[in-house]
């Protein structure tokens, strides 16, 4: 999970 993706 990188900074650009908000994997909630």
Swiss-Prot record:
Instruction: Specify the superkingdom.
Output: Eukaryota
**Protein name per its UniProtKB record:** Unknown protein 11
What organism does the record attribute this protein to? Ginkgo biloba (Ginkgo)
């Amino acid at each position: 999970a990188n900074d650009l993706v908000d994997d909630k």
